[in-house]
């Protein structure tokens, strides 16, 4: 398949100081893990050189050490939402070092769509499979979706982490759907346990995907 493969370090090097990143996943499940770990290393090097380096991080829920923990320890977070539990992150918030909005998880995608946090410069999504369909990639999420469809649609550029630990058949577990926002929201049309209202993948224009970390 014709996409640009890159290392996590190469992907992280594309992200600039001050940019906003929206990520896949819900808790550590489904969160991209490699790129943010390298981004923390970049932040440490930039700070040691006397340069500012911080990014905004928006997710569906808590992440894990490689995102909330490593970036907090690297003094690399300019703003964070929503709810999160990582102990290193909590420590830095309670020291007054990180502007933090303990937003209810269910509001994160909607508030990004409203534009409350500015532009979404990057989406970083963990996926288990990628299909090329016309001018788009259909990407299949791993263990959790979170705000992935909103992140991918709003982002100017997208990095995919193709996690081979997950069986490609995991792509059948998701029903990807974005509701309308208030005041136009309608009832979510699920009435029976087998109902499906969305798609099993997130569709992303090829020209937005700058690289795939494998």
Range-by-range predicted roles:
Residues 1-214:
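Conserved alpha/beta enzyme-core scaffold
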């Amino acid at each position: 398949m014709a996409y640009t493969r890159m290392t996590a370090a190469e992907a992280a090097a594309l992200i600039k100081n001050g940019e906003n990143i929206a990520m896949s996943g819900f808790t550590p499940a489904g969160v991209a893990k490699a790129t943010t770990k390298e981004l923390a290393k970049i932040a440490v090097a930039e700070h040691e050189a006397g340069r500012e380096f911080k990014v905004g991080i928006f997710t569906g829920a808590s992440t894990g050490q490689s995102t909330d923990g490593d970036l907090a320890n690297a003094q690399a977070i300019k703003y964070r939402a929503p709810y999160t539990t990582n102990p290193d992150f909590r420590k830095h918030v309670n020291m007054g070092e990180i502007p933090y909005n303990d937003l209810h998880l269910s509001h994160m995608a909607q508030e990004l769509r409203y534009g409350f946090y500015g532009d979404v410069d990057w989406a970083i999504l963990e996926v288990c499979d990628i299909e090329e369909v016309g001018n788009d990639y259909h990407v299949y999420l791993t263990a959790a979706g979170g705000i992935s469809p909103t992140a991918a649609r709003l982002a100017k550029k997208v990095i995919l982490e193709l996690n081979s630990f997950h069986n490609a058949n995991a792509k059948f577990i998701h029903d990807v759907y974005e509701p309308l926002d208030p005041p136009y929201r309608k009832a979510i049309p699920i009435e029976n346990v087998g109902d499906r209202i969305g798609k099993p993948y997130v569709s992303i224009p090829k020209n937005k995907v700058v690289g795939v970390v494998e």
